[in-house]
Amino acid sequence: MTKKIISLLMIFATLLIITLVSYFHYNQLPIYDINLASKFILNEQTNNDFDEISEILGFDSTDKLLIIHADDLGLCESVNSATFESFENEAISSASVMMTTKEISEVSEFSSKNQNYDLGIHLTVTSEWKYHKWGGILNNEDISSILNKKNHFYWNKRKFTKNGKLNEIRKELQAQVDLGRSMGLNPSHIDSHEGALFFDPDIFKLYLRIAEENDLLAFVPSQASVHFDQNFKKPKHAIIIDQFHMLPEGTEINQIKDYYFNVIENLSPGLSQIIVHLGKDEKELREITIDHPNFDYRWRQLDYDIFNSDEFKNHLKKHDIKIINWKDLKKLI
């Protein structure tokens, strides 16, 4: 009887492990730490003290504070022009810049003429597009653990997480921050392209250390706050976004507008961020996003159209949304 129970428990444990591995693999979540995986499954998130945040920023604790943030600035001319225009139209309040791409000189020029706009560094360690590839800022031999045989970043987060050496990751992340500043950017914060830096405990701590050493804020989506516990307290430079929204992969084109409007209708008091991916339906962007329906040219054109529309801006006013940016949040440190 005892042997039978032990056998059943072993079978159950094996099935549980297989289920967890399959779940994280299917959702492209490279979490290989058992403790972190359990906290993620149990949703053991750390929350902000919003009463303190709202007081420092000059708002009431009942206010709905929202950052409208554009990712991937620098990806190409189409993304750049869409983002620049969205800043000018007050359709977005913040954006972050990929330093590994060819079109960042446009961003540098724009920033030099528009120092009031809020920019961050979009720390990039993956290269997801089918043909449009990039590697790191540093020499290939200095960061070989995070490059494939063609000296491009790996195309997915799993390979980066499994192969990356911490010392090489640290050097590359610092180089990206340094390049941004050398080009005249005055970043307020860092975040992570494809969230690649959020899943491994040591890499996540490194990400936060880069923020602290450079006096920058670190974007931490609520899902990643499971890293924090009694043994690892949240550092002051880490800003947890309690309500984090980004268009889910697989969303049908005809559902995109409803998704964003529903997000606004259902925002609760507190600190929120919507991440958008802006672009224009042009030949360049179509070629970059080929065979990649998520975040492709159609998504990006719709993001641009929706957030620049009077209808959406009126929707924000109707629900009394207070728009802020990452520069505002620097008051917290």
Residue spans for each PLM region:
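Active-site beta->alpha N-cap acidic-glycine motif
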Residues: 51-130
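Acidic (Asp/Glu)-rich catalytic clusters
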Residues: 56-58, 83-89, 104-118, 135-148, ...
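Active-site beta-loop-alpha junctions enriched in small/polar residues
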Residues: 73, 100, 122-128, 193-195, ...
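N-terminal pre-catalytic segment of deacetylase/amide-hydrolase enzymes
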Residues: 3-67
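C-terminal domain-boundary segment and adjacent tail
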Residues: 218-221, 292-333
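Catalytic domains of cell-wall/extracellular-matrix polysaccharide-remodeling enzymes
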Residues: 165-244, 248-257, 265, 305
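Active-site gating loops and adjacent loop-to-helix segments of metal-dependent hydrolytic enzymes
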Residues: 134-159, 290-296
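Structural preference for beta-strand elements that scaffold enzyme active sites
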Residues: 65-67, 92-96, 116-122, 187-191, ...
